[in-house]
């Protein structure tokens, strides 16, 4: 365990030995403050963008309605990250061709199947039976159709429980594509296959995948130049907006002087903004993005305080202060100075959010977020008590608490604030009851975090993760626990899409459900190979550079 001895500020004149993390400083410094005077797109760029958009719309509307060409165009538009301009046209087509997905070859069927499931339609997977032999195995000659194999691989990712044929399809295509990949040399197709094997569309963050796909598409000799030009221009215009947003949020962060006063916390504002961008990137959700970024930033401070810095007595006081949710509580409970900074900063953020929502006559909705914040902090406190009491709970107890410590119930609820009229009181009443789709997303978040960060956390001293809980309860090795937890994560993805198909088209609009799904996608990305939030300088830094700094030429 890594320890440091620090003297707490004047109100608690005692020496306390505290744990500290091994995280590095921010890799960005004041970089994003440089965009304060960024003006956005020029009038000429705006006009060009609008003209190109209408040309793409014509292409989409005029494409043959019953042809593979239409599906290919929809897929390309989605992969290029510009589908948000044509949601109505895409939905209108997909919902009227719901029963036609089984027509065509492997590529056509798999492509249509995936596009329908992405839209929230649970179409049957029986159409794939014609590609299997008498034993139920996929026919080996399919390996000669690389495009079809890739399409089947992507489609099978959207499987739910009981769809054994899709489980088999995923195993088959994963194995065969890995064998085929070296034979494709360094072609654009090889790059797409390699990317899909690591980052399937199911897990994709729109802005990250769009940046990559624009490059793939440009190398395709059959690319449509008009569509490519539109995708590039749209990416760059959005990037300018995102730069300006992050500049404004960075100014807020600097004014809090967090790094100076709370040196133990992870200074990860750009990474948090990237997280929010993964939930929604569209210009109409600018207010929601700013709200969510500030909210997650405060959660990160609180998380670090409960995980490594606060004593049990201090955390008891802070938990009570959160429960009271009153600025006077910091003085009444005599919070330590460093905790007052966090507490007052949190309440200030919520006051600011309330003012933003008042413009839409929706300030009352903030109470839903506050309720979830209180639940989350109480769950953090439970973990602290386990740590100080040297207790390793049973897996069931750990996971019940872990739904809240994942922070995703709180984050998902807060992500809907600032989204406008689409998020109604009925929607918030639904989400605070922790529907299965949200529980599934939270389990994915909790367990992925545990898998990739538990060793580092145990070195410094932390509450037991799901890995330690499972190892102790079932008497297994770390490797065996990892396998079991990976299996639980896979099953949770199935749960998530099962519920998406059930709820889509009910009182909850698809755009709200996508926030929950996108949160799961972000956590998959952040914890793909490492804890990239804590250690962004290894890989995440380069991704953020491409998404938030470097325009496409």
Curated annotation (Swiss-Prot):
| Job description of the protein | Sesquiterpene synthase involved in the biosynthesis of volatile compounds. No activity detected with geranyl diphosphate (GPP) and farnesyl diphosphate (FPP) as substrates.
According to the UniProt entry, where does the motif DDXXD motif sit in this chain? 303-307
Which GO terms of type biological process are on file? diterpenoid biosynthetic process
Which SUPFAM superfamilies is this protein grouped with? Terpenoid cyclases/Protein prenyltransferases, Terpenoid synthases
The name on file for this protein is Terpene synthase 16
Domain statement: The Asp-Asp-Xaa-Xaa-Asp/Glu (DDXXD/E) motif is important for the catalytic activity, presumably through binding to Mg(2+).
CDD domains from the UniProt entry: Terpene_cyclase_plant_C1 (cd00684)
Q: Which pathway is this protein engaged in? A: Secondary metabolite biosynthesis; terpenoid biosynthesis
- What family does this chain come from, according to its entry? Belongs to the terpene synthase family. Tpsa subfamily.
Q: Please share the entry's free-text remark on the cofactor.
A: Binds 3 Mg(2+) or Mn(2+) ions per subunit.
* Record keywords: Magnesium, Metal-binding
Q: Where does Mg(2+) 2 bind?
A: 303, 307
One GO MF annotation is:
magnesium ion binding
**Entry annotated with the keyword Phosphoprotein:** no
Quick one: which residues bind Mg(2+) 1? 303, 307
Upper lineage is: Eukaryota, Viridiplantae, Streptophyta, Embryophyta, Tracheophyta
Sequence positions that bind Mg(2+) 3: 457
**Cofactor(s) needed for function:** Mg(2+); Mn(2+)
Tissues/organs with expression: Expressed in leaves, trichomes and flowers.
